[in-house]
Amino acid sequence: MKIIAVGMNYAAHNKELHHSLELSEPTIFMKSDSSLLKDGKPFFIPDFSSEVHYETEIVVRIDRLGKNIAERFAHRYYNEVTVGIDFTARDLQNKLRAQGLPWEISKAFDNSAVIGTFIPLEQAGDVNRLPFHLDINGSKVQEGNTSNMLFSVDKICLLYTSPSPRDTR
């Protein structure tokens, strides 16, 4: 299984983090199998970070093999969606970026990719206009809509040329 993640895909979040609002290509990174946390299991803040941030995300499950997928056919390669949380050890990420080093470990640590229960796209609605939010202790702390993504799910699928069935994105 591969967990393919897309960073800096929302202009508002990029502005908050002082990143460029103009990207020519999505920022793609991988998460390891051990990053996956599901079935309502608890998340524990890792010992190596004192500044863990969360980002609510839409997660799409790839269900077909494909290569060199045309954008107009990309929707045929995924059929389920859920909400996820992408945890980031922000202090570690900032330190690694400042040194010009890869920062993937700050996002790909154990249990850093929380996912909910997948539902069929037919029940979820248009993947390009899905609202989502995160509540903590009854208070809404994040909300978004896939219509605000800089790169659509279909566009991202074009870059992922050899998906394995059951991959999550």
How does the language model describe each region?
Residues 1-159:
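Catalytic-core "active-site belt" of small-molecule-metabolizing enzymes
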Residues 163-169:
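Single conserved hydrophobic/aromatic residue that forms the stacking wall/gate
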